[in-house]
A protein has these predicted regions:
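Conserved catalytic-core motifs of eukaryotic protein kinase domains, centered on the activation segment
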Residues: 44-46, 74-78, 229
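Primarily recognizes the serine-hydrolase "nucleophile elbow" in alpha/beta-hydrolase
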Residues: 92-160, 209
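Serine-hydrolase catalytic core
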Residues: 6-9, 52, 151, 155-282
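Alpha/beta-hydrolase active-site loop signature
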Residues: 39, 68-72, 138, 254
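Catalytic nucleophile-loop/oxyanion-hole region of alpha/beta-hydrolase
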Residues: 71-105
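Short, surface-exposed "cap/lid" segments of acyl-processing enzymes
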Residues: 22-67
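N-terminal cap/lid segment of alpha/beta-hydrolase-fold proteins
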Residues: 1-30, 259
């Protein structure tokens, strides 16, 4: 059973979709809240959030997918969206799903920038019990290495396109969006505003990361140019914070897991891990 819902945050109305098992007796106490990436919306990359929420429903999970302010069908100015506002929205979504369903705890499922949001929101609510982070960028550390790897990957991709006949045909016909291409190259693959707002830079990211005491699962694509740097960073960060480093690497996969086999592996791995957390009697975390 899935239905649309609306939640209010800072005077803006956010659109969401709730998924619940028809039989209330089969519902697990752990609800899933999905946090899309910077340029995404509630369906996730190539509808992975929608697919996972529907699959999760058959396993007893309640899910909430929603659009952040300024994204998708939610109200709010696109240019005013920051990681800080996205964290506020994630906390409001957590409150909403707890109030409107029988769930008693929440797991945050973040994709790319949504993983940063999950990390930022984690210790801010006592009923956030677990996190699943897909292709999480580096927080609480130097991103220069992974940003450079991403920029090189973007340049390589456009370099390969230059060798294609259809690219030159588009250029001759005036159908090539050169302004957009230059914008992407200059930004190193980052969208407008993704470099970070002053309010985002003011967040103590290590405190947010280490302050969350629940389990985390990191999932990366083996062929994502940022993976090596991220794995080294988060292994060290987890060790420094005294936390377990649960990791799954999808061999051959890119940043967004663009194949049916890769996305199935991500979804199945996430749900298997989440079900183990839902059936565990261990508390989620201890600090705000």
């Amino acid at each position: 059973m899935e239905r649309h819902c609306y939640l209010e945050v800072a005077g803006a109305r956010l659109l969401g979709v709730i998924h619940e098992a028809d039989d209330a007796a089969t519902r697990l106490p752990l609800a899933l809240v999905y946090l899309h990436g910077w340029a995404g919306y509630r369906i996730g990359p190539h509808q992975m959030f929608t697919k996972m929420a529907r699959r999760a429903e058959t396993q007893g999970f309640t899910s909430l997918r929603f659009d952040f302010r300024g994204r998708g069908d939610s109200e709010g100015a696109t240019a005013e969206t920051t990681l800080t506002t996205m964290i506020e929205d994630a906390l409001a979504a957590t409150e909403y799903v707890l109030a409107k369903t029988g769930a008693t705890q929440v797991a945050l499922i973040g994709d790319c920038s949504g993983s940063e949001v999950a990390i930022g929101a984690g210790p801010q609510h006592p009923q956030i019990a677990a996190q699943v982070l897909w292709s999480a960028p580096i927080v609480a550390g130097d991103r220069a290495r992974t940003d450079l790897a991403k920029r090189k990957s973007v340049l390589s991709a456009y370099g390969q396109k230059l060798l294609r006949r259809d690219t030159w045909s588009k250029l001759v016909r005036g159908n090539l969006q050169t302004d957009q291409i230059l914008k992407v190259i200059r930004g190193g693959g980052k969208g407008a505003g993704e470099q970070g707002d002053a309010s985002d830079r003011a967040i103590d990211w290590f405190a947010r990361f280490s302050g969350f005491r629940g389990p985390r699962l990191f999932i990366y694509g083996g062929n994502d140019p940022t993976t090596a740097g991220c794995l080294a960073h988060y292994a060290e960060l987890c060790d420094e914070a005294g936390q377990r480093f649960d990791l799954h690497v999808v061999e051959g996969a890119n940043h967004a897991f663009y194949s049916l086999a890769w996305e199935d592996e991500v979804i199945d791995t996430s749900l298997t891990w989440l079900r183990a957390q839902a059936l565990s009697e261990a508390p989620g975390h201890a600090t705000r």
